[in-house]
Every structure is written in structure tokens, then in C-alpha cells.
From Swiss-Prot:
The lineage of its organism: Bacteria, Pseudomonadati, Pseudomonadota, Gammaproteobacteria, Enterobacterales. Keywords: Biotin biosynthesis, Methyltransferase, S-adenosyl-L-methionine, Transferase. GO terms for molecular function: carboxyl-O-methyltransferase activity; malonyl-CoA methyltransferase activity; S-adenosylmethionine-dependent methyltransferase activity. It catalyses: malonyl-[ACP] + S-adenosyl-L-methionine = malonyl-[ACP] methyl ester + S-adenosyl-L-homocysteine. Belongs to the methyltransferase superfamily. GO terms for biological process: biotin biosynthetic process; methylation. Its EC number is 2.1.1.197. Pathway: Cofactor biosynthesis; biotin biosynthesis. Converts the free carboxyl group of a malonyl-thioester to its methyl ester by transfer of a methyl group from S-adenosyl-L-methionine (SAM). It allows to synthesize pimeloyl-ACP via the fatty acid synthetic pathway. This is Malonyl-[acyl-carrier protein] O-methyltransferase.
Length: 247
């Protein structure tokens, strides 16, 4: 089971510098934006808003935005940058919101931290008006393959995070009319520590919380020998899934 308190702590620690390292979130969010039309003057829920990067984008278009996050520090960062109209510290699996409130519910790379993906999707559908949409991006099984492969060579007890399969994500979508798309994006880094640092600094170090915190020179060399590599550097892949649910 996912420990949401630890996740909130991990993202909270990353909040101050999150926007300097959140290239992955922005790439996924921009792809998600391309899946739908641009909306103006509607009510939007940004569920798992982080620092409010996309909340601010939606608000600048004249929309009324509610920014929601489970991390108080992330929400405070969003508030300090005036990203939204309203701010709500809450769990996506138990939204303290009445039915049929928002025209659009948006969640970018947050649902993978829920214990019950289908419950979170159901909640987003519940608070969205009939005729509205729930749009989301998430990470699917197969992500971080390179890290998992290499790390098991220095820690045989390491257990990777179990991201849902694409099919399981499809089955979680409330039996509604849904468009699902996915893409594998591979990033490259000049050093393996940079690759690991990239997901640590966006709060996602929780996924590797069961590995030892001290990497000796010997272990680093072993990681280098086993981490997939090409002329561009050490590789780290994410399987992104994008969903649009029509209500």
C-alpha cells in the first residue's frame, strides 16, 4: 500500500525547488493540454496541483481554478505564486467537495500516488458536471525500467513501485466514454546520479524509499555497469498515459 504521508513529505521537501526540476511534469501536462480544446471562463479543479504551474495557466485564460493537493507545502507554494482562485488541502480519493461542481477536472501526474486509482477517478467524475470532462495523465507500468534494472544489481531485496498497467487504467475509468493514449518517453543524463536526482527532486524519491541511502563508489560503479546507456547518456524512461473522460 502507498504511504500517502511519506509521499506528502517527499513532495513537501521538494516544493521550494520543484519548478526547477519538474520538466517531466511539464512535458506530460503540455501533451495532456494538446488532447483537449482550450477553455475560457469555466470552473476547473486542478487535482494534485503541485506548485500550481498548470493552475496558473488555466487561470490566465480567465477560468476559475481550485488548486488541490495532499502536500501542504506544495499547496502553500501554489498559493504564494497566486496560481489559483481557491486552495484545498485534500485527498483525491476522498474529495470534500459536493457533486457536479466543476466543468473540468484536471489531474497531471498525480493519480499514480493513489492507493485506489479507480476511487480517485470516481471522485473526480463525481465532482464534475454532466457534460464536463475529467482529463488526466499518469505513469504506467514499465516506467523507470532502467533504474529498476540497475538497482536490483546492488540491492537484491529492492522492490520497484508497482505502477498500474495501461489496461488497468482503462478499466478504472468509470465505464464512461473515455479516450486513452500512451507514449514512452526516454530521457538521457550524463551521470547516473543526475538521473536519480531528477526524480528525487520532484518528490518522486518515495518510489525508491526502500533502497539504501548511502551509495558507495563501488555501488555507483556497479550501477554504471548495469544502467542502460547510449551515446546520449544514461537512460530513464517513463510510460505516460493520457485520459479524457466525457461525462
Amino acid at each position: 500500500m502507498i504511504d500517502k504521508k511519506k509521499i506528502a513529505e517527499a513532495f513537501g521537501k521538494a516544493a521550494a525547488n520543484y519548478d526547477n526540476f519538474s520538466v517531466i511534469q511539464r512535458i506530460a501536462g503540455n501533451i495532456l493540454l494538446s488532447k483537449i480544446e482550450t477553455f475560457f471562463n469555466i470552473s476547473i479543479l486542478d487535482a494534485g496541483c503541485g506548485t500550481g504551474w498548470f493552475s496558473k495557466k488555466w487561470r490566465q485564460l480567465g477560468n476559475t481554478v481550485t488548486a488541490l493537493d495532499f502536500s501542504k507545502n506544495m499547496l502553500l507554494t501554489a498559493k504564494n505564486t497566486n496560481s489559483a482562485d481557491y486552495y484545498l488541502h485534500a485527498d483525491m480519493e476522498q474529495l470534500p467537495i459536493c457533486d457536479n461542481i466543476f466543468d473540468l477536472s484536471w489531474s497531471n501526474l498525480s493519480l499514480q500516488w493513489c492507493n485506489k486509482f479507480n476511487k480517485a477517478i470516481s471522485e473526480l467524475c463525481r465532482v464534475t458536471k454532466p457534460g464536463g470532462m475529467v482529463v488526466f495523465s499518469t505513469i504506467a507500468h514499465g516506467s523507470l525500467y532502467e533504474f529498476n534494472k540497475a538497482y536490483r544489481t546492488i540491492n537484491s531485496s529492492y522492490q520497484e513501485n508497482k505502477f498500474l498497467s495501461i489496461n488497468d487504467i482503462k478499466l478504472s475509468c468509470c465505464n464512461k466514454k473515455t479516450l486513452i493514449d500512451n507514449i514512452l518517453i526516454t530521457f538521457s543524463f550524463s551521470k547516473i546520479l543526475e538521473a536519480m536526482y531528477s526524480f528525487k527532486k520532484i518528490g518522486a524519491n518515495y518510489i525508491s524509499s526502500n533502497h539504501s541511502k548511502i551509495l558507495t563508489k563501488k555501488k555507483i560503479r556497479q550501477l554504471q555497469e548495469n544502467w542502460p546507456y547510449n551515446p546520449n547518456g544514461y537512460l530513464l524512461s517513463y510510460r505516460f498515459v493520457f485520459g479524457v473522460i466525457y461525462l
